[in-house]
Amino acid sequence: TGRARAGYNRSPVWRGGAILFGPQPRKYDFKVNKKIRKLALRMALSSRLAGDNLLVVKGFDLPEAKTKIFAKIAGNLGLSKALIIAPEETRELVLSSRNLPGITLTTPDQLSVYEILKHKQLVLLEGAVEPVETRLK
């Protein structure tokens, strides 16, 4: 008849047929040097300090794991979208802060530039200042 040979009915030419060059899995991650990562962390912290969005809180002890108590303290400090850096994640801190929208709890070794820039305010608890400083050196 002069028409091109289509082969079988599951050929990529046909509707409902095979996929010829389908999507391939790719890696989109790339390496960032240690010096650049440290510089980015330093710049993120200095931007929060320059904008008066960095608080250092002394004596932030919770008597029990209650969100109500934590919300009251956060309200008194004027925190809305804040990243709280604690020296360690205690049971009371984790349980009382996890249900508050916009408030994230982290430790100095888990601190990331993305988290700092994502949150408007940065709260350093007293014991977390020194580990953050040692990470910047």
Predicted regions mapped to residue ranges:
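Glycine/serine-rich anion-binding loops at beta->alpha junctions
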Residues: 1-21
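Extended polybasic, low-complexity segments that bind anionic RNA or targeting/receptor surfaces
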Residues: 22-137
